[in-house]
Amino acid sequence: MMLKPQYAILRFAKYKGPEIGHIEAHNERTKEKYASNPDVDTSRSHLNFHLVQPERKYRAEAERQIAEAKCRIRKDSVRVVETLVTASPEFFKGKKKAEIREFFEEAVRFIEKHQSKDSIISAVVHMDEKTPHMHLSFVPLTADGRLSAKDIVGNKKKLTWWQDEFWKHMVKKWPDLERGESASETGRTHIPPRLFKEATHLNRQRDMLLQLLGEVNPLNAKKKSTEIE
């Protein structure tokens, strides 16, 4: 039986204003329920752990760093970049929590090689969803003190560079890992994780509704499906 490939996965998302509070609520698990994300099993949230503990609210910490750097800023400037780090589900199968922690600690070390350690607001690993993953949030300050997400995560070429370097770094410890494919290479449009999960949830609800319609009147199920679409 051919084994499924195990990919090292690194993704970036940029945030400018009020949405920073939304990602903080998700990452830090400050809500009691997550209706828009059915993958969250709150009974397992105690298994989540921080590799970088936030000292204050994400937005407040971002504004503090920006003010301290005395850099120019616009109202629509990206203040926080969120890095999503994970691997294929097969990679984590059979691994103990200490081994999983080691994987994400190594990922943090990789980020710190290319971005100031002091700019990192939080790095939290979620163990309460289907696949372990880390949300690492940082303020996109350049080495010369500018606020520029474009310079750091940049264009398609820069994103490909990040993917290459991440895989080169991680494969030294985990030789079975393969390089993940970036959206620029596959041609797929990137969808933020939160929106992707919401869409998945809506599709599940639709499938359940169609099933119920079929049970009530199998002859009309196909017609109802067309109406729903």
Where are these regions (language model features)?
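N-terminal nicking endonuclease/strand-transfer module with a His-rich metal-binding environment
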Residues: 1-229
